[in-house]
């Protein structure tokens, strides 16, 4: 796999783009708007094409994503697990925010 330089400003733009999705979950799954998660998944696919090209993607439930990065088995390195979550809590009272929720500011 070729090496890439990480630009901190581009990384910040990617993060700001990611937090613009109101991926609010609910204990009652019927109240969760999964179209927001679908849009977020599309954003990830467009923003990180190499991840989607080189890693195997498994959808674990209505919104869960599991990426499998297969090693060569030659290095003897221990397995590595990276985890994150996509859901957020409801924004509450927007008047209490310095910047609008989901603005990516």
Model-found features: residue ranges?
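Short secondary-structure boundary micro-motifs
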Residues: 1-2, 7-9, 41, 51-52, ...
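Active-site-proximal helix/loop capping residues that flank conserved catalytic or ligand/cofactor
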Residues: 13-16, 42, 80
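Active-site metal-coordination/substrate-binding segment of hydrolases
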Residues: 77-105
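A non-catalytic alpha/beta surface segment that caps or lines the substrate-entry region
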Residues: 20-77, 101-104
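Non-transmembrane, interaction-prone segments in cytosolic or luminal domains
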Residues: 3, 7, 66-69, 80
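N-terminal hydrophobic or amphipathic helices/low-complexity stretches enriched
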Residues: 1-31, 35, 92-96
């Amino acid at each position: 796999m070729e090496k890439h330089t990480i630009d901190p400003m581009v990384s910040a733009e990617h993060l700001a783009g990611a937090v613009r999705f109101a991926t609010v979950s609910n204990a009652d799954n019927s109240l969760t708007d999964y179209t927001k998660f679908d849009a977020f998944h599309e954003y990830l696919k467009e923003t990180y094409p190499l991840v989607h090209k080189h890693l195997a993607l498994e959808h674990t439930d209505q919104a869960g994503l599991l990426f499998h990065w297969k090693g060569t088995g030659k290095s003897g390195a221990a397995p590595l697990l990276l985890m994150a979550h996509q859901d957020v809590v409801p924004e509450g009272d927007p008047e209490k925010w310095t910047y609008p929720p989901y603005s990516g500011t």
